[in-house]
Amino acid sequence: RVFFAHKDPNPLVRNKSRQILENAGIEVFEGLEACQNDKELFSEIEHFFEAYDYFVSNKFPFIELKLAVSADGFIALNNYTQVAITHSEANKKNHRLRSYSDAILVSSRTALLDNPSLDVRYVEGNSPIKIIFGLSSILPKDLKLFSKGKTIVFSQNLQEQLKGKAEIVLLPSENFKDNWLFMLKYLAGLGIHRLMVEPGKIL
């Protein structure tokens, strides 16, 4: 017997394995039935593969947005002082989502104001590639996210101060949409399926 919960959306291989197995007299169970009708398990498997499915179908990374908002609709104080909106369990969930992601993106403004690490600390798992998306901001080389792991900076500046600290990719346009699509195509070329975005006020 063979159990598989999720079909590969790639048309080059889709359904071929099942047919080969059944032709060989092997009993095959698929989808929810393969999970013994455990809907929670099936849902977890579907979530695990959703980014891959999207990537195969659209040739773009699957974007997952994380945003902490207060009850009255704010994400930060007016003076940009950092304030905790979420509690420890929410932080663990956020870091678990990070660990599922191939890359995590913030704007250059968020990188400058919050100086985040963008790594995985509260749960076990791999830290994603760090992405900074901005236009003309100059980024200091001593920001936390340059201290370890791979970082890619999409910018209209050469960011020469970051030589040896990050990969710099020059944006081709003054138009946000054009630059955003350029970045997504670039990341798709790197094989990044799941992109987690932690936006600030503007991005």
Residue ranges and their predicted role:
Residues R1-L203:
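Zinc-dependent deaminase
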